[in-house]
């Protein structure tokens, strides 16, 4: 064996090594400069540890071979283990917790799951655009800070259904971000200092511990919040909490869950915000590129809403982002170590335990790969026709192999959307045209001090932008198109042909594609179907029917459920596959050029060599540039179906049409529970919107169309038949160990409002028939006490009984709450059901006048979602949360309910003045009053004076229907007097904090209207009514019921 070369590098000093060769504020830049001096491989000594750096594509290609090298956790990343322990990013190679978490979480980051997150990503992108639009073109924007807010809010919302609302808070960053920035910087610094120096930095160590504790506490609070308030959503947080490792059957411990939440919150936003910041820096430095990018967005999207389907049609945006990440990889290195002694580059010996850092800022500018202009920003080099020709492992900003970034697809989709949204909406300019790029370093990099100004395009105003985005419909989900039905009768499906589908799928994508293909094949007459993982096909490939394989490559290897199948094919002992007819559809991602479609190609070739008959050419879908379902449909129509027609449909003389599924005979009837209530009619939701800003109690507006005319008048009510919140239903199911689809049948019951002798699912029973949140009664407490074997629990329940009003009724403690608290209670489900009242209708005031929009109603309501008075979790209002869950097209059941006769408008609105007083959602009936007055005015009739006194928190918070009321004021329909409790001095609040203060300020006007026979109306809480009445009696004397009419809720 020839002698190995010594690895060059600056000469280290005793104890401190090469510490003095590094600028500790810009250590990365110091190391990059060394690459120019010492070549493609060099080493330095820091903290008594040798660090080897590789800077050429040729060396990186070797280091990415996972049969020779694996990830090493050292330096700053190792210091982060104090924070993230054995999370996905900081776990050592082979660490057990990493394996469990990785296998559980992989499906959560599959392409289809990522596409499902698009709507939430779009929500946060809109918030960014609204902020910039409302700030105006004169505002200086710290682009890195705003992108940090965006990416943190996005990862929290998309993966944990958790809103941080960074754009609605103060100018300071979220506490998690503040702690994160400190920890990242300190970990980087500690990795550069000798341990003796770190030991004497006591204050820094204490601060580090404090920030770590704060971050883990925030993650713990997220877990507690979800457990206290379960949500039936298919998000990452539920996967973390409830997922099970398919290999060991284990779930994740709370410590491991916290570590991975922190990992996602950091890794899921810090590098992406840097990518976006550098991308816009380069765009503003290159006006021609900026113009071409904007033109692409305008041509593909126009001025309409951006959809997930648009992203695959923006290749130049994709190339710009890749080029930006090439020049400025925001995670600037990853580290590997050999599994056994390895010779690198043919001349350097690397031993196990020695770590080699892939120095991406230099590797990705390798002139041997990218040419003499490798340091220049030239996006065309990253267009697909050029990118696909790059040597293997030339572009590795997301790391390598199984330890590469699990959230890469998430980050890329988010960044594409944001770049497209900003280009579509704004013209950007750098605040300082002479700005020279400075890089801020922690363990990641981003521009330092780069600021821009944003001007809305197309002459839009901020208000117009808001209306445009709010009116945009929800994006369609992938693969949702219907297949055209032919004219073959569905009865022909009986005795249909057989077909087998096998899939290899880690993330669930190929499994979903196989299911979709099976579904469409059902309509083509292949009704005898078998669908299973590829491993089940070992020694089990059928020969009397077509076999369709849908699979992908996972980090160069087969998926977990296809490993045995591929090993079988490669073993050399496969029996002849003569008689097997098959076709392969492969999925891949072009950025993994070395392994693109590797496994689908290998399976296709090995089966063919073993004697199987290839039905048609292999289908392929590139997840980077296309919609997988669309590619599958094209391959099905143009390749697979003709092949199946030729080989398996001879009996039909070539006629191979889809079954007409529309000839299925079905009937639809109203839910059983609707028939148990009188006078309910069907309504269809046509609009729903939030009326308040984040940070204040939520109020919503829902509008629905009814199927028949009613005698409703302004001021009347409607009864709504609700369902219980899903999280409350899940609690009940869990307490009685029931699945949602368990069937319950009442063989006999004294309750006439429960379905008799009719099977009903457990979820429907708890959701639609029972008052799960009803406070427990005294008798309930006695019954529960009699069923517990615990003397301690029995005494506690009896204590509750003796102090019923204060401990149960006033705190709204339900039977379900008690069952969750006293786990010793063994209550039969039948007894539980008998304890609960039947779910009742909820009553709301109309907020739309029938004359204003015939056959339509609207409600204005507060969404009750607040900490439970019992101190256990949150209390969810049944009716309001049901209404808040509706979307346009939803069906609800309502019945009209007249208000008391006095709570209506005067018969003669021309001569009788009115004064309306309310706060918050108490505005509802008065909105219908005002709309009816508008209809009266439009008929050419004169109107008597009307005053509306309205109390809320503030003009940008919960000033309900502000613009609409302003229009009515301009028309002379009403005069509005507001009181702002949070900003009383804001015009036009005139210093009045509450409604009664505003009434007092208008004493003269009110007395004059009272003298002209005005009627006073009030709608609100008992507290409001008490304060208002006292104020009015001080100025008007005794109030008669005929002229002072109240509705208290």
UniProtKB/Swiss-Prot annotation:
GO terms for cellular component: cytosol. Residues 678-906 form the FAD-binding FR-type domain. It catalyses: 2 oxidized [cytochrome P450] + NADPH = 2 reduced [cytochrome P450] + NADP(+) + H(+); an organic molecule + reduced [NADPH--hemoprotein reductase] + O2 = an alcohol + oxidized [NADPH--hemoprotein reductase] + H2O + H(+); dodecanoate + reduced [NADPH--hemoprotein reductase] + O2 = 5-hydroxydodecanoate + oxidized [NADPH--hemoprotein reductase] + H2O + H(+); tetradecanoate + reduced [NADPH--hemoprotein reductase] + O2 = 7-hydroxytetradecanoate + oxidized [NADPH--hemoprotein reductase] + H2O + H(+). One of its GO terms (molecular function) is flavin adenine dinucleotide binding. It comes from the Eukaryota. Its cofactor is FAD; FMN; heme. Binds 1 FAD. Keywords: Electron transport, FAD, Flavoprotein, FMN, Heme, Iron, Metal-binding, Monooxygenase, NADP, Oxidoreductase, Transport. Its EC number is 1.14.14.1, 1.6.2.4. Self-sufficient cytochrome P450 monooxygenase that catalyzes the regioselective in-chain hydroxylation of alkanes, fatty alcohols, and fatty acids at the omega-7 position. Performs hydroxylation of C10-C16 n-alkanes and C12 and C14 fatty alcohols; and thereby enables the one step biocatalytic synthesis of rare alcohols such as 5-dodecanol and 7-tetradecanol. Converts 1-dodecanol into 1,5-dodecanediol as major product with very little sub-terminally hydroxylated products with the 1,4-dodecanediol and 1,6-dodecanediol more abundant. Residues 462-492 are annotated as: Disordered. Residues 471-486 have a biased composition (Low complexity). Heme binds at residue 405. InterPro entries: Bifunctional_P450_P450_red, CysJ-like_FAD-binding, Cyt_P450, Cyt_P450_CS, Cyt_P450_E_grp-I, Cyt_P450_sf, FAD-bd_FR_type, Flavodoxin/NO_synth. In the N-terminal section; belongs to the cytochrome P450 family. Residues 499-640 form the Flavodoxin-like domain. This is Self-sufficient cytochrome P450 monooxygenase CYP505E4. The keyword Ligase does not apply. FMN binds at residues 505-509, 584-616. Pfam families: FAD_binding_1 (PF00667), Flavodoxin_1 (PF00258), NAD_binding_1 (PF00175), p450 (PF00067). The keyword Metal-binding applies. One of its GO terms (biological process) is mycotoxin biosynthetic process.
């Amino acid at each position: 064996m020839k002698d190995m070369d010594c690895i060059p590098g600056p000469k280290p000093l005793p104890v401190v090594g090469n510490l003095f060769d590094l600028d500790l504020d810009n250590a990365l830049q110091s190391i990059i400069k060394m690459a120019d001096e010492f070549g493609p491989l060099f080493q330095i000594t820091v903290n008594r540890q040798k660090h080897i750096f590789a800077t050429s594509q040729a060396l990186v290609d070797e280091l990415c071979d996972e049969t020779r090298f694996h990830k090493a956790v050292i330096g700053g990343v190792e210091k982060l283990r104090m924070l993230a322990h054995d999370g996905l990013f900081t776990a050592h190679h082979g660490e057990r917790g990493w394996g469990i978490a990785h296998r559980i979480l992989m499906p959560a980051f599959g392409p289809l799951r990522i596409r499902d997150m698009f709507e939430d990503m779009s929500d946060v992108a809109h918030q960014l655009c609204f902020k910039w639009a409302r700030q105006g073109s004169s505002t200086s924007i710290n682009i890195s800070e705003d992108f940090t807010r965006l990416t943190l809010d996005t990862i929290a919302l998309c993966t944990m259904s958790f809103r941080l609302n960074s754009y609605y808070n103060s100018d300071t960053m979220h506490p998690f971000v503040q702690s994160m920035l400190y920890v990242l910087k300190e970990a980087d610094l500690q990795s550069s200092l000798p341990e003796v120096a770190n030991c004497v930095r006591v204050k820094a160590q204490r601060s580090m511990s404090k920030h770590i504790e704060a971050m883990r506490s925030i993650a713990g609070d997220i877990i507690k919040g979800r457990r206290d308030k379960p949500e039936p959503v298919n998000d990452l947080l539920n996967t973390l909490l409830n997922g099970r490792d398919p290999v060991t059957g284990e779930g994740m411990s709370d410590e491991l869950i916290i570590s991975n939440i922190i990992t996602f919150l950091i890794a899921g936003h810090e590098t992406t915000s840097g990518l976006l910041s550098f991308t816009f820096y380069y765009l503003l430095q290159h006006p021609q590129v900026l113009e071409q990018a904007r033109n692409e967005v305008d041509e593909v999207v126009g001025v309409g809403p951006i959809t997930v389907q648009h992203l695959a049609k923006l290749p130049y945006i994709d190339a710009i982002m890749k080029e930006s990440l090439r020049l400025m990889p925001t995670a600037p290195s990853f580290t590997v170590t050999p599994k056994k002694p390895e010779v690198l580059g043919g001349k350097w010996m690397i031993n196990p335990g020695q770590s080699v850092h892939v120095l991406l800022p230099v590797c990705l500018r390798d002139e041997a790969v990218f040419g003499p202009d490798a340091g220049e920003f030239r996006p065309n080099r990253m267009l697909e026709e050029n990118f696909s020709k790059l040597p293997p492992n030339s572009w590795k900003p997301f790391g390598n192999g199984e330890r590469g970034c699990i959230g890469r697809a998430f980050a890329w989709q988010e960044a594409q959307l944001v770049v497209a949204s900003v280009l579509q909406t704004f013209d950007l300019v750098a605040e300082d045209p002479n700005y020279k790029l400075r890089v801020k370093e922690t363990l990641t990099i981003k521009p330092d001090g780069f600021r821009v100004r944003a001007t809305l395009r197309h002459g839009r105003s901020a208000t117009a932008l808001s209306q445009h985005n709010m009116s945009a419909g929800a994006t369609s989900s992938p693969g949702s198109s219907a297949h055209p039905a032919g004219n073959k009768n569905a009865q022909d499906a009986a005795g249909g042909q057989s077909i087998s589908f096998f899939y290899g799928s880690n993330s669930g994508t190929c499994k979903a594609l196989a299911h979709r293909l099976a579904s469409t094949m059902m309509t083509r007459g292949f009704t005898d179907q078998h669908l299973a993982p590829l491993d089940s096909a070992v020694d089990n490939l059928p020969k009397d029917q077509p076999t369709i394989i849908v699979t992908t490559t996972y980090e160069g290897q087969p998926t977990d459920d296809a490993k045995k199948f591929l090993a079988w094919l490669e073993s050399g002992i496969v029996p002849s596959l003569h008689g097997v007819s098959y076709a392969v559809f492969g999925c891949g991602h072009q950025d993994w050029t070395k392994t693109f479609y590797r496994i689908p190609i290998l399976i296709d070739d090995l089966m063919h060599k073993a004697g199987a008959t290839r039905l048609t050419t292999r289908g392929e879908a590139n997840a980077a540039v296309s919609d997988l379902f669309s590619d599958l449909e094209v391959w099905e129509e143009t390749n697979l179906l003709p092949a199946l027609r030729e080989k398996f449909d001879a009996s039909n003389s070539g006629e191979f049409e889809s079954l007409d599924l529309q000839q299925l005979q079905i009937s639809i009837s109203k839910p059983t529970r609707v028939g148990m209530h009188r006078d309910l009619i069907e309504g269809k939701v046509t609009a729903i919107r939030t009326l308040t800003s984040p940070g204040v109690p939520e109020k919503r507006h829902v509008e629905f169309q009814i199927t028949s005319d009613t005698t409703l008048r302004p001021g009347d009510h409607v009864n709504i038949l609700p369902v219980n919140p899903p999280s409350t239903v899940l609690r009940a199911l869990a307490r009685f160990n029931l699945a949602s689809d368990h069937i319950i049948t009442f063989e006999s019951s004294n309750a006439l409002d429960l379905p008799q002798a009719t099977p009903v699912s457990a979820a429907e029973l708890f959701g639609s028939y029972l008052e799960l949140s009803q406070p427990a009664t005294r008798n309930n407490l006695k019954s529960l006490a009699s069923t517990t074997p615990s003397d301690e629990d029995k005494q506690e329940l009896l204590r509750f009984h003796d102090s019923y009003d204060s401990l149960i009724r006033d705190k709204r403690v339900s039977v379900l709450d008690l069952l969750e608290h006293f786990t010793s209670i063994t209550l039969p489900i039948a007894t539980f059901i008998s304890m609960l009242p039947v779910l009742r209708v909820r009553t709301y005031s109309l907020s739309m006048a029938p004359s204003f929009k015939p056959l339509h109603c609207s409600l204005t309501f507060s969404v009750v979602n607040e900490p439970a008075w019992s101190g256990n979790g949150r209390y969810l209002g049944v009716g309001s949360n049901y209404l808040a869950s509706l979307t346009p097209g939803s069906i609800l059941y309502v019945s009209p309910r007249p208000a008391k006769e006095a709570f209506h408008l005067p018969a003669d609105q021309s001569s009788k003045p009115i004064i309306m007083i309310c706060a918050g959602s108490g505005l509802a009936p008065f909105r219908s009053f005002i709309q009816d007055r508008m209809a009266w005015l439009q008929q050419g009739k004169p109107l008597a004076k009307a005053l509306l006194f309205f109390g809320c928190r503030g003009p940008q918070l919960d000033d309900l229907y502000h613009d609409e009321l302003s229009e009515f004021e301009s028309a002379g329909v009403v005069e509005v007097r507001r009181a702002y409790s949070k900003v009383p001095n804001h015009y036009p609040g005139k210093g009045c904090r509450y409604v009664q203060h505003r009434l007092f300020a208008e004493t003269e006007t009110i007395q004059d209207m009272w003298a002209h026979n005005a009627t006073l109306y009030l709608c609100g809480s008992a507290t409001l009514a008490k304060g208002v009445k006292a104020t009015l009696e001080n100025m008007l004397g005794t109030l008669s019921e005929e002229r002072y009419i109240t509705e208290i809720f």
